[in-house]
């Protein structure tokens, strides 16, 4: 059909193939018959009244087949109308009846059989809003009257119709001896026919081509400049429904770009001129496009509206099947329950359900096309909770009073009982016993197809795994005794104290020396917190809040606060004690931690909680302010062993080689101290010192 060629040309992005039509110059209707027949067309139309069926008195002439052909009726060369030519094929039906009246001579019978046959053939034509009926008288000579044989055809010119209209044609005789013939045809529009210069309504019709431009689809509207027309982009989910997406009046020519992800099979286009009574071009060029079908499945959604009720949302009809399936807890593919449960055709945008199905969390629905699952949703997942480890038994009717039972597994439906090595086969007798004693839940039943039963597997799982649980208990007991044997080591590990190292910001070289001390202490083992390792938290919360939080936490855990005194720290402490204004540098947090710890010293709460240290050669012990001397004061690295004992609270160091470890710490501190003092606090002091990985105390 021309319409098919039109859509094919759109898909290829080329000009469509068009059909040239025969032209009729006569404005009146005419009729003609094939050789041997005579025809006469009644003037004007007749009433379209088929009447009731009657019995044929003998051989009668009846229509047997209808054909149509499109032509142009052209009173003027450029003023034509689309017209439907109808060809009616005729045949003789029935036989001569034997005479019932006595006394008829053979000559009279022969005379009646040598007479010609006549018939009145009615052609009924409907194409909204047009409805017409034409009457043809057809005569067949006696020599052509052969019952059961075709005698020829009659041609009627013609019924006028609109471009793109759907026409219906009926044919019958008066009186009517058989059921009327009928024919329905969709006429092409201006695009599919060579009529642009012949039919005035097609003169200003926009032409449209579809092509691909990368990830986009380009709609090219070939319209003369300054020509106004309307463009409508819409969805047609069902034949009689239309959902408009975009409508606009445009001036040609135009290029309209669509994203390829927006294409779906029911996306259609209408274009028409703004001239009065202009024809509309309507087509859906993406119906057979594979990409449009893929997009449709990506857009489609399967929603559970309520327990057991779902809805498939999609902009177009989906060519799929909806199947009830069983989802096992192991996340294996959902197994369709067809048979015995019949599947449904996919219906979009309407609530659906499987009737007579009882609720179970493992029952789901899936939408499939050509054995491929596209969408799936579990109907009772929200109302009945997670999947259950139940075994689904399928009871099938095998005879009038006979049934068979099989267990649905990933490998298929295992007959019960069975010698297979599957889980259901091993428990076959027990499952059958549960089934016969009505311990299983019936999910679905059909007197002709069968039933579905869900059998709980909890008791079989408990019995099977009892030895495993005993083994786990024995393993747990063994692990418990092993941990008891390691009790001393764990206590030693828990006995390692936490320490907060507080210092002043005396320059980059001094900060590297502080970092070396913190790294060395963290290997003793001690859990060390220092602001150098927590710059991000310090910046986020503020120095005062960070120091206060760390001090309170460490003291609650029984830890110790280490005060590292330097000349700058001593000077600021003196200013604090003399109630002088302290203006710290941009990176100096000394004022913050002084406000946290000084009340403990002034109120006598420092003993056992604080330790003071300073580096050899950098400070004289008498320089430390007197309020801070109530806490032990050590010089590093010369008094390192005593300092470590004070940090451990009198406990011995951890197992291993403590003397070697103390010696390594001493050497590390002395090397860092020598490096910083030799550089005279020059920028870049101690850059070669690797602080190593450090543990921040949260």
Swiss-Prot record:
Coiled coil regions in record: none
Subunit organization: Homodimer; disulfide-linked. Heterodimer with IL17RA. Heterodimerization with IL17RA is independent of the cytoplasmic tail. Associates with non-glycosylated IL17RA constitutively. Binding of IL17A and IL17F induces association with glycosylated IL17RA. Forms complexes with 2:1 binding stoichiometry: two receptor chains for one interleukin molecule. IL17A homodimer preferentially drives the formation of IL17RA-IL17RC heterodimeric receptor complex, whereas IL17F homodimer forms predominantly complexes with IL17RC homodimer.
Disulphide bridges: 190-202, 266-316, 268-284, 325-334, 364-378, 406-413, 440-455
Residue stretches spanning the membrane: 465-485
Keywords assigned: Cell membrane, Disulfide bond, Glycoprotein, Inflammatory response, Membrane, Receptor, Signal, Transmembrane, Transmembrane helix
All ranges on the Cytoplasmic side of the membrane: 486-698
Protein name listed in UniProt: Interleukin-17 receptor C
Annotated organism of origin: Mus musculus
Induction statement: Induced in lung epithelial cells upon bacterial and fungal infection. Up-regulated in lung epithelial cells by IL17F; this might account for a persistent activation via a positive feedback loop.
Encoding gene (name): Il17rc
Pfam families tied to this protein: IL17_R_N (PF15037), SEFIR (PF08357)
Topology Extracellular: residue spans: 22-464
Residue intervals of the SEFIR domain: 496-645
Signal peptide: 1-21
